[in-house]
């Protein structure tokens, strides 16, 4: 059975790992035929991950989009509706961050972070949940962060955006439970992704890898539709990496 899955931020990091994990899952689940709709700001990244997923036997569809741009959100939504007519899974993974001391952060840092993490995530979810509500099925993942429930000194704007996402998650559950839609909040701690920039070997050794997040996401999706994994919290074994 074909499953239409949209993954935002699929070109790098956690999104890329989730796409590959879904592609590989079909080997062990004969009734699961993923159609991976992969979205990212960078076409070259999408082309690469698309080829990797196809090598695993999955069908792929790529669309370059920046979810901080409302025109791109509308285009992405229209693409799903017109090409497929339904959607089984939305992985809200696209996210950005600007970090620094409170006094150093700017209005541009604020807008850059909020436009993707909150505005884009909200309006994409709003549009595609309407489709799930009509079809009375679906699953939405929010890749938030441990920073959705815990503050970090040099992450004030990022924490605000993630606390906000957490509010959206809880609100969506109130709607989703009435129409058989599953909502899963995934809260990773430190994961070695491009968002961290250059880190030394000692710090990298303390961090999780994107694959560590991808496997539980796919496992949660493949649960029977009568069951929802509401929250997945993953941290490095050594705990959170502090920024003070």
Curated annotation (Swiss-Prot):
Question: GO molecular-function annotation terms?
Answer: nucleotide binding; oxidoreductase activity
Record's Pfam families?
adh_short (PF00106)
Activity versus pH: the note is: Optimum pH is around 8.8. Activity drops sharply above and below the optimum and is absent at pH 3 and virtually so at pH 10.6.
Q: What's its catalytic activity?
A: L-threo-7,8-dihydrobiopterin + NADP(+) = L-sepiapterin + NADPH + H(+); L-threo-tetrahydrobiopterin + 2 NADP(+) = 6-pyruvoyl-5,6,7,8-tetrahydropterin + 2 NADPH + 2 H(+)
Instruction: Tell me how temperature affects activity.
Output: Optimum temperature is 50 degrees Celsius. Stable at 25 and 50 degrees Celsius for 2 h but loses activity at 70 degrees Celsius in 20 minutes.
Give the Enzyme Commission number: 1.1.1.325
State the activity regulation: Slightly inhibited by N-acetyldopamine but not by N-acetylserotonin or melatonin.
* One cellular-component annotation, GO: cytoplasm
Binding residues for substrate:
99, 145, 158, 196
Spell out the protein name for this chain: Sepiapterin reductase
């Amino acid at each position: 059975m074909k499953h239409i899955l949209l993954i935002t931020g699929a070109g790098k990091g956690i999104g890329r790992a989730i796409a590959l994990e879904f592609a590989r899952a079909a080997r062990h689940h004969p009734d699961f035929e993923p159609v991976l709709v992969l979205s990212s700001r960078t076409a070259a990244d999408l082309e690469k991950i698309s080829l990797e997923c196809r090598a695993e036997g999955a069908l792929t569809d790529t669309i370059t989009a920046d979810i901080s741009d409302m025109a791109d959100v509308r285009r992405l939504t229209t693409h799903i509706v017109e090409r497929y007519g339904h959607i089984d899974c939305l992985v809200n993974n696209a996210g950005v961050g600007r970090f620094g001391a409170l006094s150093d952060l700017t209005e541009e840092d604020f807008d850059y972070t909020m436009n993707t993490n909150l505005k884009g995530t909200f309006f994409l979810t709003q549009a595609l949940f309407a489709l799930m509500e009509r079809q009375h099925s679906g699953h939405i993942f929010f890749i938030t962060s441990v920073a959705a429930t815990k503050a970090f000194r040099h992450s004030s704007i990022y924490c605000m955006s993630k606390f906000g996402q957490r509010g959206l998650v809880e609100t969506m559950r109130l709607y989703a439970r009435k129409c058989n839609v599953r909502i899963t909040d995934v809260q990773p701690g430190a994961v070695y992704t491009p968002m961290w920039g250059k880190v030394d070997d000692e710090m990298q050794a303390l961090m999780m890898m994107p694959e560590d997040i991808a496997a539980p996401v796919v496992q949660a999706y493949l649960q029977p539709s009568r069951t929802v994994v509401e929250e997945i919290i993953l941290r490095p074994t050594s705990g959170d990496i502090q920024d003070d």
